[in-house]
């Protein structure tokens, strides 16, 4: 059994009290991060099914295809409705009030 004087001396040693736990944290964190970063490299090496790959290539969305979809849309008939503030009644501002639903007269 270790003498009480030796235990007291070990408790007062700052290297053992602060340095060893810090060293364990750094080394343990390094191994932990290595495991998490390995997941990224494992995910890259996984090959997907060729049928699924063909399906993904067929459904590829490009900027030009999205532009063609909205090119003929009309954006003239919309109304800007302000959202309610925390102290205001949302029923009045979200278009449920008949006065706000009246069309503009030009």
UniProtKB/Swiss-Prot annotation:
Membrane association type: Single-pass membrane protein
Location of this chain's protein in the cell: Mitochondrion inner membrane
Main location: mitochondrion
InterPro entries on file: Cyt_c_Oxase_assmbl_COX16
Stretches the record annotates as Disordered: 81-106
Subunit structure and binding partners: Associates with the MITRAC complex. Interacts with MT-CO2/COX; specifically interacts with newly synthesized MT-CO2/COX. Interacts with SCO1, SCO2 and COA6.
Family the entry assigns: Belongs to the COX16 family.
Identification of the protein by name: Cytochrome c oxidase assembly protein COX16 homolog, mitochondrial
Organism: Mus musculus (Mouse)
Gene name for this UniProt entry: Cox16
